[in-house]
Amino acid sequence: MNPNQKIITIGSVSLTISTICFFMQIAILITTVTLHFKQYEFNSPPNNQVMLCEPTIIERNITEIVYLTNTTIEKEICPKPAEYRNWSKPQCGITGFAPFSKDNSIRLSAGGDIWVTREPYVSCDPDKCYQFALGQGTTINNVHSNNTARDRTPYRTLLMNELGVPFHLGTKQVCIAWSSSSCHDGKAWLHVCITGNDKNATASFIYNGRLVDSVVSWSKDILRTQESECVCINGTCTVVMTDGNATGKADTKILFIEEGKIVHTSKLSGSAQHVEECSCYPRYPGVRCVCRDNWKGSNRPIVDINIKDHSIVSSYVCSGLVGDTPRKNDSSSSSHCLNPNNEEGGHGVKGWAFDDGNDVWMGRTINETSRLGYETFKVVEGWSNPKSKLQINRQVIVDRGDRSGYSGIFSVEGKSCINRCFYVELIRGRKEETEVLWTSNSIVVFCGTSGTYGTGSWPDGADLNLMHI
């Protein structure tokens, strides 16, 4: 073969190979594009059609230069759709309470900007717990903190932070309020916020960050609500509200709310004589509240709420060891399951209790006449027997000589049961402590446990001599 023939032969072979490579590239390109659009076709819904997100298997072909690699399998993870809470699990069996959280707000305010607050509480969404309080529109180290012992001003707002985070300057102000309640229905937060003139206040109902409904004071005498969490079952939330005399006959109503809209209002019925500042918990299929009688009884009123037919039944905690302050000492106190005990009935403090079969768990101040110290215990047959005074599983939360304040309950749903937790308000400043001109609080939080636990005391702990006056 002469040189010219060799050149022609090599050229022909090269041209043939180039042509084959060219067609291979086109085939690979067509295959890749076809697979891409087929995947889009299988995974995209038609226009205007809602497609539910479900776990699916997606095949993706990855092309690198001209080589088609192995097919990989990837599992798409879809977010779980939000559902209304129904609280149908049983109550957890507990032996007592274990420490959970403490915010140390007053101690921290000695060196930083922390809000002046009172009336704190805790409530949880399905994932996290949050602490709430009514701010006074000022920080402690601010001259506006003078005379913040006042309950109702137009500057008070509802504050909300993740539990354990003190109310710093970056804290969200949820609404304007000098009385409030909050709860999560499984999809969004509901906030009940009361503000305005004592004789013509407004309650705003804020759901998912939007004002949905409102109601005006019906008795023109300081409309007020729970100062702790409300409860939602299957999308219906209940909140107890009172308007009228603080030491006499008042007008209490239970409001039923769906996504922020008031759908029904029931009047208090039953034997409770005076109901304020209820601490409520889910007791499927209804809601149960233990409240404050500021008129006749140092035994606490009970309000049972039927979600389905909106009926209300009220009575009193039977236990011969009573839970309000002031009260008689335990050796001389008495109780009644239906009526107030007419012992040290005037005044009072927000508190809590919950049933455990025929027994009752409760918390109260250790001092019988003032808001000092805090203890919890179980009264055997305390839910059914007015003569019951057998106290077991007692725990000291705050020593007798240290200040306490309001306390309330909140519920946390676990995998198999619903746990009960409580918080204690640790008030500092005026009127009792005159070294400073302000009144504020921190909190300590405990939750039910089926395990073992030790002893201690968890007071506020701030040295007011180191604080802003």
Show which residues each predicted segment covers.
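Beta-propeller and closely related beta-sheet repeat lectin domains
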Residues: 120, 179-181, 226-229, 276-279, ...
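Serine/threonine-rich low-complexity intrinsically disordered regions
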Residues: 52-77, 174
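Aromatic (phenylalanine/tyrosine) cluster motif
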Residues: 22-23, 40-42, 205, 410, ...
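Membrane-proximal alpha-helical anchors
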Residues: 32-51, 80
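Beta-rich carbohydrate-recognition and catalytic domains
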Residues: 79-113, 118-129, 133-173, 184-223, ...
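Surface-exposed, short loops/turns at beta-strand junctions within beta-sandwich domains
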Residues: 232, 414-418
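Single-pass membrane-anchoring alpha-helices
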Residues: 2-38
